Amino acid sequence: LNDNPSLAADSPSLFTQTAIDNYRRAKGDNSDGLGYNWDYFDYAFQPSVLQDYSLSVRGGTDRARYFILGSYYKQGGNYKHSNSDNANNFLRYNFRANVDVDATKRLKISVDLGARVTEYTYPGATAANIISLANTQPPYLPIVLPNNGNEVNQGDFEENGGYLLYADNDYRYNMLGQLSRSGFSKRTRRYLQGSFKLSHDLDFITEGLSIAAQFSYDTFNQHTINNSVPTHSTGNLTYPGYSTWMLPEEYSIDEWKNNSAYWIQNGSYVTANQRTTDDAQGNSLSHANPEGTSRFQARLDYARKFGDHNVTAMVLYYMQNKIVGKEVPYRYMGFSGRATYDYKNKYLFEFNIGYNGSENFARGHRFGVFPAGSIGWVVSQEEFMKNVRWIDHLKLRASYGLVGNDQIC
């Protein structure tokens, strides 16, 4: 059906046979700049290249061990025609170091350090905008207007890198402009993690008894450099900040497509968004609220076997303090206990209790008691199940407990 949707409903004008033949040309043959049959997804997107490098070293002695890791990761962008690869990519740098030392026969010390930096650079135009443009822009519209030698526009060509981007009153954005002349933004995130742990066997008191304590601290900060070209609005219409050009209003793009007479006759171009050059890129720096989280826990563990009887117990203290910018600190504190018993790994009993608090609640209502218990029976350990070859493990378990949530106030 020869139907030109950009014409009025009562217009008898259709695409000429020349325009139809041009539209049928092989994809990618747009060397004269007239477009005809753009595949915008092919024009705008490309497969990305991933690079991942890492170097690790480990070693030590009977009493001390270490591990060091450094890595570099780069993912190229999926956009073609961006200003450079550095304006369309993702970078990540990782570092980790772990050291474990047996200070004495019973005392062990562990130090873990980790750091990560990520950099994400992207065009000023959003991915949603670029994908929407690829889906909706008519494929017969030109992307770049050819330099037809008209003296009126020679200065404009020089000021715009030797080419003019096409747009009109109906299609105000240009794919090449969105990719290469909308500016860019760069978001950098930094993470730092560290922990220090001590553990000590207390078997000189009783067999199976041990104690451990750990302190950790994590930090995070983020800043974004915004060098994107701002858009501007006229009435209820939004225009890009880069300059776009079109034919004078007395000409239509359909005449362009049907006979190309206008550019052959050296006609002049006029601005489509009242800009002869691109607006200046933005130059702003924004910071996310820095975050710092400290955690401390201490625990006493007991595990021992008495013939066919297995007994374990644990008492834990936990504290967390999180600071986000100038906000009120988020604090959590709690004590937990657990005791387990089993007979021949067949009959299982467990009891847990927690006494936990959060600063989200008012004074006098910050702590709660949360008990839980369970019983279990490993049926497959019974003598009458030994000859049932199609069942390796069968356990029945029932449990009941109370839990808390501090995100309800």
Question: Which residues make up each language-model segment?
Answer:
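Transmembrane beta-strands of outer-membrane beta-barrel proteins
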Residues: 66-68, 109-111, 209-215, 311-315, ...
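Transmembrane beta-barrel architecture of outer-membrane proteins
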Residues: 50-54, 90-94, 189-195, 293-297, ...
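Short loop/turn motifs that connect adjacent beta-strands in outer-membrane beta-barrel proteins
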Residues: 62-63, 106, 188, 201-211, ...
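Flexible loop and strand-edge segments within Gram-negative outer membrane beta-barrel domains
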Residues: 31-71, 75-82, 86-172, 185-189, ...
